[in-house]
């Protein structure tokens, strides 16, 4: 793939290139997650793609393969409280920063999905739709998505009345109906408009 070659490890052979992506900016509940991945060019992983187009079982299998074969990977998050105190964009960038800083080696370059980048101690380049173009970003999107989905399963066990296992925190009709019935739980983002509608401030 031309885009993968353009942004690949060959240009930075000493320390590698990290792909960075997030999961969970839009939902009404739960932390926002981010991951950073430095792939091993000697151990390519087939099937990497934007996590949103992969079925859950495929994502899980790829996540395990990424963890086993990548040169370095890290998953991080910013909590619901952090989202409410600093806003979702800043919290997302904080989670990305934590993910890159958690790698066991500092990359020469971080390729970040989207058009906003965190402050890092290495060179940074943003790439629109990078999760579909650059394998390292695809890998990061898969790790972030599977980690957040696991977190929402945990929240479902704590607060089964909301159906987090079904909508993953997004503002679906079911979720909004359960919010009207039960009100927000401690993991709902009080700075988000649908939660503010219940008269609970951040």
Swiss-Prot record:
Cofactor, how bound (note): Manganese or magnesium. Binds 1 divalent metal ion per monomer in the absence of substrate. May bind a second metal ion after substrate binding.
GO BP terms: DNA replication, removal of RNA primer; mismatch repair
Assigned keywords, A-Z: Cytoplasm, Endonuclease, Hydrolase, Manganese, Metal-binding, Nuclease
InterPro entries listed in its UniProt record: RNase_HII, RNase_HII/HIII, RNase_HII/HIII_dom, RNaseH-like_sf, RNaseH_sf
Cofactors, names only: Mn(2+); Mg(2+)
Family: Belongs to the RNase HII family.
Name under which the protein is recorded: Ribonuclease HII
Organism: Bordetella avium (strain 197N)
């Amino acid at each position: 793939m031309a885009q993968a070659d353009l942004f690949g490890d060959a240009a930075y052979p000493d320390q590698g290139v990290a792909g960075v992506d997030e999961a969970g900016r839009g939902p009404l509940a739960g932390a926002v997650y981010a991951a950073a991945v430095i792939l091993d060019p000697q151990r390519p992983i087939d099937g990497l793609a934007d996590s949103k187009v992969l079925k859950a079982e495929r994502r899980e299998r790829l996540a395990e393969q990424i963890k086993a074969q990548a040169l370095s990977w890290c998953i991080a998050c910013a909590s619901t409280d952090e989202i409410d105190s600093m806003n979702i964009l800043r919290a997302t960038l904080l989670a990305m920063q934590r993910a890159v800083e958690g790698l066991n080696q500092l990359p020469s370059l971080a390729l970040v999905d989207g058009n906003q980048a965190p402050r890092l101690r290495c060179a940074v380049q943003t790439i629109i739709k990078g999760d579909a173009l650059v394998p390292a970003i695809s890998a990061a999107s898969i790790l972030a998505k599977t980690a957040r989905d696991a977190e929402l399963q945990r929240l479902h066990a704590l607060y089964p009345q909301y159906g987090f296992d079904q909508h993953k925190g997004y503002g679906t009709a079911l979720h909004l109906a359960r919010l009207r019935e039960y009100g927000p739980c401690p993991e709902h983002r009080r700075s988000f408009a649908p939660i503010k509608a219940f008269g609970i401030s951040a």
